[in-house]
């Protein structure tokens, strides 16, 4: 055989070292986005808020207080949800903190208006517990407030909202 037609044999170690020099192909998702682009374009966000049952908690020195169960769903995934238990005062404080950031007289965008809360009742907890209608109206008011705050993308990105959800 002629030396021009002789097949060339590669050295195995030489091939492996050349493979190691080749950069990996960047990962692309189905729509052509890179992994970095996908993470920037598809940040986690709250997609549903449900205020559920109230729970009566026995506090220090026998004084009781009420908490509300709040289920927050992330990215429309039931398995990606957070369940919080918050007192009315904590929700009230969230509103006060939002009003400091988004004052009522400074509405550049109408979606940034901080919604109102149902009024705080000064009646004793025992008397309130007797009124199931009052509790349901309170739950509906909290549902309305939290939905309007937590589902608003501007409020969602606010540090006080993140702190409320994560604490």
Curated annotation (Swiss-Prot):
The record ties this protein, via PROSITE patterns, to:
PX
Bilayer disposition of the protein: Peripheral membrane protein
Membrane-spanning parts: none
- A single GO molecular function, which one? protein-macromolecule adaptor activity
The processes (GO biological process) annotated in the record are: protein localization to membrane
Taxonomically, the superkingdom here is Eukaryota
Q: Which Pfam families does the UniProt record give? A: PX
Q: InterPro entries recorded for this chain?
A: PX_dom, PX_dom_sf, Ypt35_PX
For this UniProt record, the keywords arranged alphabetically read as follows: Endosome, Membrane, Vacuole
Residues of the PX domain: 46-167
**Does the keyword field hold Signal?**
no
List cellular component terms (GO).
endosome membrane; vacuolar membrane
Where found, per UniProt? Endosome membrane; Vacuole membrane
- What biological function has been recorded for the protein in this entry? Recruits the lipid transfer protein VPS13 to endosomal and vacuolar membranes.
Q: Domain comment?
A: The PX domain binds phosphatidylinositol 3-phosphate (PtdIns(3)P) which is necessary for peripheral membrane localization.
Q: Which family does it belong to?
A: Belongs to the YPT35 family.
Name the UniProt record assigns to this protein = Endosomal/vacuolar adapter protein YPT35
Q: State the organism of origin.
A: Candida albicans (strain SC5314 / ATCC MYA-2876) (Yeast)
């Amino acid at each position: 055989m002629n030396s021009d037609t002789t097949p060339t044999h590669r050295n195995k170690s030489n091939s492996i070292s050349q493979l190691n020099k080749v950069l990996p192909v960047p990962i692309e998702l189905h729509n052509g986005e890179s992994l970095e682009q996908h993470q920037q374009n598809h940040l986690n966000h709250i997609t549903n808020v449900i205020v559920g049952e109230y729970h009566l908690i026995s506090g220090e020195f026998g004084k009781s207080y009420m908490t509300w169960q709040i289920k927050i769903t992330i990215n429309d995934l039931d398995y990606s949800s957070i369940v919080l238990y918050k007192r009315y005062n904590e929700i009230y404080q969230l509103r006060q903190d939002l009003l400091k950031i988004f004052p009522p007289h400074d509405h550049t965008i109408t979606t940034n208006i901080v919604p109102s809360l149902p009024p705080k009742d000064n009646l004793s907890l025992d008397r309130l517990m007797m009124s199931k209608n009052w509790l349901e109206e309170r739950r509906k008011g909290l549902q309305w407030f939290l939905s309007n705050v937590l589902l608003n993308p501007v409020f969602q990105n606010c540090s006080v909202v993140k702190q409320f959800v994560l604490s």
